[in-house]
Every structure is written in C-alpha cells, then in structure tokens.
C-alpha cells in the first residue's frame, strides 16, 4: 500500500506507523490510519489516533477518539484521563471536570495527574480559590507543584514569592522553557527588565539550538515569500513564542515599537490564520499599517471571547481608539461589551476612558470627572509619600522597597490623568490653561521624563516662553548626548527654534552640526534617519513665519534635498505648501518682494517636487476620513503652486 510517498508493506504497518510517530509526523499517521478504514475504529487505532491528534494540537478530534475508547474499554481509567485532558486543551472546561469526576479515587497512579489537571482547569476558569484548594492536596516539593504554586502567587500579585517558587521548580526539575518563561513574566511584572530579558534570551538561545526546524529569526524565504512552519507541538513546548512575545512587550513598554516589531519578526514564520491569540494581539499593537489594521485584529480577538482572547485586548482596543481620537468607536465598544467592562477594566481605567469620551460632548463634565480622579490620586500620593518618609526613618529596607513600589504605582496612575487634563486645554489651543495643569502637578511629576517633555511642549507653543521651554528640552538632549538620534526629532527642532528665538544662534548651529554628524554616521551603518530634515523644516518654517521667506525656503529646500530625494512625502510637503502659500499671499498683497534669484530657486524647487512627487499622495487622512478615489498628489499641487508663483512674479518662462 502506497500513501503519499509512505510505503505500508504487509506485516510492517505497525512498525511504519511507530517510526512515523517517532519522527513526530503526526499528520501522516492520522491520514494513514484513517485511510486504512477498519483500523480507525479499533482500540489500537483509536488510541494511536488520539495520541497523534493530541500532539498535532487537534484537541477536539483527540477528545472524540478518547470518548470512543471510554465506551470500548470503560474500565480503563487512563482513557478517561486522556479524554479530560483533550477537552481541557480544547477549552471545554465544564465537560473536562465532569469526566475527571468519573475517575475513581482508587486509581492511585492517576491521582496526582487528576489533581493537577483539575487545578489547571479551575485556574483557567479563573477559580483561583478552587485551584488553591486542589493544590493543597497534591504532593509537595515537585517541580509541577512548585510551578503551579508560583502561578497562583503570580495571579494574587505576589510576584516576588512567585519568582521564588518558579526558580525552585527549575532547581528541582531542571531547565524547562515554560517555567523559565514564568520567571521572566514575574520579573516583567516587577519591572525588573534585565532579569526578564536574561530568561527570555536563554529560552530563545536554547530554542534556536535545539529546534532549527522552527526557523526562528527567519520570517522570509530567500525568494521573499512568507514561509510557514505551522504550529508543531515542539514550538508550544519550546517556549519560543511566549519568550519573544514577552521581549516584544518589554520593548513596547519602553516606547521602542521598532524593537517590539523586530522581536515579533524573530518568531517562527506562520500564516496570519495560524497565529496564536497573544502574537496576533501584539502584532495589532505594533501594526505598521496604522490603527485601523490593528483595531481589526483586536476586534477579531474580542469576538473569539474567553479563553482564547487575551484579557488585555478589551482595554487596549479602547486605548488605541482614544489615542487616535476614535471616541465614537470607543463609546460603541463600551456600550456593546458592558460585561467585559466590569470584568477587564479597573475602576481607574474606566473612569479615565469615560472622561476622555465625555470630553467630546461636554468639556465641563469631562474636566469635573478628571478633576475628581486627580484629587483622589493626589491625596493617595501624599499619603504614600509620608509613608515612605516614615519607613526611611526605620531603616527597614524591605518595607522601604514596598513603600516606594506603592508610590511609583500610584504615580503611574496619576500621570495619565494629568496629561488628559492638559490635553483638553491643548486641543483648544489654550496653552496657558495646559501650563496651569503642569504647575499643579509639579509636586509629584516634576522628575518624570514624560511630564517634563510635555511641559516643554506646552511652554514652547505659547510663543513667548522659549527660554523656559529650552530649560526642559536641554536635559533630554544632554542625557542622550552619546546617541542624539535617540532623541525625538520634534525635541531637537523645538530646541533649535528656542535658541534662535532667544538669539542663541551659535547654540542652534552647534546642535544642528551634531545632528548632521550623527545622522551621517548612522547612515553609513545602513540606518535611515530624518532628524536633520525635520529640524531644517521647522527652522525654515519659523523664518517663513517671520516673513524671511528667502532664507526660510532655502532651509526647507535643503531639508528635502531640493525636492528630489526620498524625504518628500505628505508630512513634509505640508510644511512646504504652507510656507509657499504664505509667500504667495504676501506677494498678492504686495507686502513681500522676493529677489529674482530667490524666485528662480523656489521655482526650481517646485519643479523638482512636481517631477518627483507626481504619484505621491499630497494629504494625510485619519482613520475616520474617507480617502478620495483619485487623491491629489504632491506633483499636481506643486504644479499649481508654481503656476501661481509665475503669475504673481509676472514671469512667462519657466
């Protein structure tokens, strides 16, 4: 008998089947047995099929096989256990518990396994008290028991104790990538980044060494097409997926979205339909295609429901909506999923999101809600600050560490509320009102990097506080003097403008030279940065705003490489056309006279923009805006601006 290249000779069928199982070719075994016919209904055939379905992660099919075996051999308790185990993996928890209860307590060999499986089912069902009760009945000191104790401690937010249990499990049972991942996750919750990365790195290194067939770090074939390795059981047991997702979470938490994407790209290559929920969730958060694509993925996960849908999905889909000002969508999601609101949103997060959504219809009510929340958190911070001082006087290091942790956690909650209150004023161009909010929160937040950055922006936007703004920007630049490219281009541009506006031109030029030198160095390493481009654009726009169009437009043209480089796109073109339109308006009113040579330079610049931007979209559309069927391009807009400049300059020749 020949089956897809597998020769099943008479008298050697069993040997061939077991060799395939040894090679972990479970799908081939399943096809062979089901094609034999009568063998699929025998006890041996069903047992083999159940084993192969389970290891091929087809748990419902495995459960069906073991259910039939329970009927064929009702006295074999192991079949009931395998049946329950398959149901558990398939997420059918209630039925799994029912089957386990049918196994007699007299089955000593299975007692520990049954208790372990029951506690796992209750844990997955979020019945942590029930899981703890069963855990107390199990043999103590084993690797499995220590790991499960750690899981329950982790769930109770006792992360330090959880780390100790997980590490004890590793000592007793040797290295286990899934237990090592648990240690990393507990360190992650304790904000111990270095320790978490150590464990994830070890998991990945062992995975690369032991499982080259998974193609870790090789998302794409040499021909450029995606190559899927599927979801073999070895990938699940290697901890690779969990470790790289945690690494991505660490990078994302640090604000390094590119690093998070790189970590996800190192995952074994799979088709999107094959991705596990956690990977799909993290890819949604870092989707380069924008918020709409990410929201689609999160909405799909939300429809899956528990236990497949990660519990963070609901909060993240709402936060992404608010970040991209899709407030109506956020309100609809909250209204449609009231059950998830109470289950997955803390009272704090619900109140914050509710205030942001309310701000779209009633600013006064939103400010009142945020004010109440801010007052409550400020009171808590003062109380915790006093506690820290009291504990410091006792020299109890453990108590001091706990008190500082509580204070930092409260500060993490307070900061977004401060930003939300300032944002309400900011969006109405009430920068003085936003500054008042920063003054009122300085007591707690003045040392926070995010707070200082945004305080600098608020002062900068007022137009007469450039010295004060520079005082906030300068420490950020000094802190990253060894890698100035890691500083936001907006900060560098605003600091340059602040120097220019306070007659510190030498400092501005020195900063621009540093940026140019660093950008050239990074460019030689194959990395592309647009920091200098953005700085020149902002500085050029500033001079244009001061009616010095000759110098301002020269700066802008230099920033965009004369309009002939890869830096010409909708974002940068916006600065160009605003300044050109300002120039045209001034010329039309006869307030501005541009020298002949300057006009020729601007015309040449627009001609380059016309040629190189012929097919580049000229406008940016938000997630809620409909993109026209034939959107305007930079080339078309540049041609119109060039025509207007020719008319106003009374030139007939290009």
From Swiss-Prot:
This protein's record includes keyword Nucleus: no
Subcellular location: Cell projection, Cilium
Positions annotated as TPR repeat: 10-43, 44-76, 143-176, 178-210, 384-417, 449-483, 533-566
Aminoacyl-tRNA synthetase recorded as keyword: no
GO molecular function: intraciliary transport particle B binding
Main location: other
Biological-process GO terms, alphabetical: intraciliary transport; protein polyglutamylation
UniProtKB keywords: Cell projection, Cilium, Cilium biogenesis/degradation, Repeat, TPR repeat
Superkingdom of this protein's organism: Eukaryota
GO cellular component, one term: cilium
InterPro entries assigned: TPR-like_helical_dom_sf (IPR011990), TPR_2 (IPR013105), TPR_rpt (IPR019734), TT30 (IPR039941)
Function description: Required for polyglutamylation of axonemal tubulin in sensory cilia. Plays a role in anterograde intraflagellar transport (IFT), the process by which cilia precursors are transported from the base of the cilium to the site of their incorporation at the tip.
Entries under PANTHER family matching the protein: TETRATRICOPEPTIDE REPEAT PROTEIN 30 (PTHR20931:SF0)
Family designation: Belongs to the TTC30/dfy-1/fleer family.
Name this protein carries in UniProt: Tetratricopeptide repeat protein 30 homolog
Source species: Drosophila pseudoobscura pseudoobscura (Fruit fly)
């Amino acid at each position: 008998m020949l089956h897809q290249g597998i020769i099943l000779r008479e008298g050697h069928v069993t040997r061939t089947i077991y060799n395939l199982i040894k090679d972990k070719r479970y799908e081939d075994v399943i096809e062979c047995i089901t094609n034999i016919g009568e063998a699929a209904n025998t006890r041996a055939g069903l047992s083999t099929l159940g084993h192969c379905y389970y290891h091929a992660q087809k748990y419902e099919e495995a459960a069906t096989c073991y259910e039939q075996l329970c009927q064929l051999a009702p006295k074999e308790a192991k079949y009931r256990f395998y049946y329950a185990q398959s149901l558990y993996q398939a997420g059918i928890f209630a039925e799994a518990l029912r089957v386990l209860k049918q196994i007699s307590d007299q089955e000593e060999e299975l007692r520990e396994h049954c208790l372990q499986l029951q506690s796992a089912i209750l844990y997955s069902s979020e019945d942590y008290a029930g899981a703890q009760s069963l855990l107390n009945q199990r043999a103590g000191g084993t690797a499995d028991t220590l790991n499960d104790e750690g899981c329950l401690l982790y769930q109770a937010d006792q992360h330090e104790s959880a780390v100790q249990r997980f590490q004890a499990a590793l000592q007793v049972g040797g290295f286990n990538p899934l237990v090592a991942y648990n240690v990393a996750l507990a360190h992650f919750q304790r904000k111990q980044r270095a320790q978490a990365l150590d464990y994830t790195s070890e998991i990945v290194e062992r995975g690369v060494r032991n499982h080259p067939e998974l193609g870790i770090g090789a998302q794409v074939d040499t021909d450029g097409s995606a190559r899927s390795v599927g979801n073999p059981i070895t990938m699940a047991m290697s901890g690779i997926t969990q470790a790289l997702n945690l690494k991505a979470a660490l990078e994302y938490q640090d604000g390094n979205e590119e690093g998070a994407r790189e970590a996800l790209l190192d995952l074994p290559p799979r088709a999107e339909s094959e991705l596990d929920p956690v990977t799909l969730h993290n890819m949604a958060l870092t989707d380069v295609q924008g918020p709409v694509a990410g929201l689609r993925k999160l909405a799909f996960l939300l429809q899956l429901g528990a236990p497949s849908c990660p519990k963070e999905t609901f909060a993240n889909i709402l936060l992404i909506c608010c970040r991209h000002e899709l407030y109506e969508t956020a309100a609809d999601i909250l209204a449609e999923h009231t059950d998830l609101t109470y289950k997955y949103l803390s009272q704090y997060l619900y109140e914050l999101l509710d205030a942001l959504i309310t701000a779209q219809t009633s600013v006064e009510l939103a400010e009142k809600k945020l004010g109440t929340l801010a007052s409550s958190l400020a009171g808590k911070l003062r109380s915790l600050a006093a506690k820290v001082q009291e504990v410091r006087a006792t020299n109890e290091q453990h108590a001091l560490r706990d008190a500082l942790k509580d204070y930092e956690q409260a500060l993490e909650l307070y900061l977004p509320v401060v930003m939300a209150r300032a944002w309400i004023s900011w969006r109405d161009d009430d920068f003085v009102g936003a500054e008042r909010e920063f003054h009122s929160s300085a007591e707690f937040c003045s040392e926070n990097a995010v707070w200082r950055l945004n305080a600098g922006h608020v002062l900068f936007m007022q137009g007469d506080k450039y010295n004060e703004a520079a005082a906030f920007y300068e420490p950020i630049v000094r802190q990253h003097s060894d890698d100035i490219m890691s500083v936001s281009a907006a900060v560098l541009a605003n600091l340059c403008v602040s120097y220019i506006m306070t007659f510190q031109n030498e400092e501005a030029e020195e900063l621009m030279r540093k940026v140019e030198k660093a950008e050239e160095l990074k460019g030689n390493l194959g990395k592309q940065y647009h920091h200098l481009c953005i700085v020149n654009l902002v500085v050029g726009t500033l001079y244009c705003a001061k009616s010095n169009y000759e110098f301002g437009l020269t700066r802008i043209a230099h920033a965009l490489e004369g309009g002939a480089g890869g830096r010409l796109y909708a974002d940068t073109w916006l600065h160009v056309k605003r300044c050109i339109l300002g120039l045209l308006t001034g010329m039309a009113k006869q307030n501005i006279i541009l020298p002949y040579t300057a006009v020729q330079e601007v015309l040449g610049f627009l001609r380059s923009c016309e040629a190189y931007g012929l097919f580049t979209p000229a406008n940016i559309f938000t997630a809620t805006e409909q993109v026209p069927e034939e959107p305007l391009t930079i080339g078309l807009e540049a041609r119109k601006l060039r025509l207007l400049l020719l008319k106003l300059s009374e030139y007939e020749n290009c």
